[in-house]
Swiss-Prot record:
This is Vomeronasal type-1 receptor 90. Glycans are attached at N159. GO terms for molecular function: pheromone receptor activity. Residues 1-20, 68-93, 157-183, 260-271 are extracellular. GO terms for cellular component: plasma membrane. It is a multi-pass membrane protein.
């Protein structure tokens, strides 16, 4: 009876896990294809649109890697070796770093876009896409430099018996590090994450201040408590602020679960729960952007209309 309940528990987690992957890949594909069509029609993309399309592509890669790792969590065939373990772990970390950097960069560039002409940030408004890509690479290099150890401490499980081992999947484990090395990389990771969250907080706070100032000016000019219709830049700013809030919430939840798992030497099934939480941003952020972006809604309606007419 206990085996049956355990089996049902694993099947339920597996269904949720793969549902998250399928839903996330679907939404990110829609978001990415929309920006591809926009580029083909208009022959240009705003910097923020370019970053969003890159973010969708990064999330597609993250969720694909997550699907491969899920196969070994729920249905291990014991065929994974060190190369597979290290490759998938390194690729997932690389893509997760790019996701964090792109989200941070999106917040910064939206703050620059919203800034008034008198602001010191105005001179950055018309920078080329090459500058934005270079900025992304610089942020990503900083991210990766503070966490390279993780990928190299993952190996295939060759019947290690130590209780201090942490399982990543059924076939892959994280080898324990000595006290000094572990705490050194922990401090570096905290410094890295606080730096990125701090940049997001500063740019988000700046955008909130600009929106509040614009609202007061609009109320003063129109002599009414109702502000006029928001501009596209202001609507985009509110969407990105919502995106930043969701990212920080998921990040804090991921850190809490990760700390709990490390304290209790979590099994692969516990790691799968952490993976579901850590990848929820990649799954739900495109849905948030699709729902709040009028251009995408109109594009989908016209596409569905043509399909029905055909």
């Amino acid at each position: 009876m206990r085996r049956i309940s355990t089996l049902y528990g694993v099947v339920d987690k597996q269904a949720i896990f793969f549902s998250e992957v399928v839903i996330g890949i679907s939404f990110n594909s829609i978001l990415f294809l929309f920006h591809i069509f926009q580029f083909l029609l208009e022959r240009r993309l705003r910097i923020t649109d370019l970053i969003i399309s890159l973010l969708a592509l990064i999330h597609l890669g993250m969720l694909t890697v997550m699907g491969f790792r899920a196969v070994d969590i729920f249905a291990s065939q014991n065929v994974w070796n060190d190369i597979k373990c290290k490759s998938l772990a390194h690729l997932h970390r690389l893509l997760r770093g790019l996701s964090l950097c792109a989200t941070c960069l999106l917040s910064i560039f939206q703050a620059i876009t919203l800034s008034p002409r008198s602001s010191c940030l105005a001179k950055f408004k018309y920078k080329s896409t090459q500058h934005s890509l270079c900025s992304l690479l610089v942020l990503w290099a900083f991210y990766m430099s503070c966490g390279t150890h993780y990928s190299f401490t993952i190996v295939a499980d060759y019947n290690f018996s130590s209780r201090s081992l942490i399982f990543v999947t059924e076939s892959c484990i994280i080898l324990p590090m000595d006290y000094i090395t572990r705490h050194l990389f922990f401090i570096l990771g905290i410094f890295r994450d606080v730096s990125f969250i701090g940049l997001m907080a500063l740019s988000s706070g700046y955008m909130v201040a600009l929106l509040c100032r614009h609202r007061k000016q609009a109320q003063h000019l129109h002599r009414t408590s109702l502000s006029p219709k928001a501009s596209p830049e202001q609507r985009a700013t509110r969407t990105i602020l919502l995106l930043m809030s969701f990212f920080v919430l998921m990040y804090c939840l991921d850190c809490t679960i990760s700390a709990s798992r490390l304290m209790h030497n979590g099994e692969p099934i516990h790691h799968s729960i952490q993976m579901m939480v850590s990848n929820s941003y990649a799954t739900l952020s495109p849905l948030l952007l699709i729902v709040t972006e009028n251009r995408i809604s109109r594009f989908l309606k016209s596409l569905l209309g043509r399909t029905v007419d055909a």
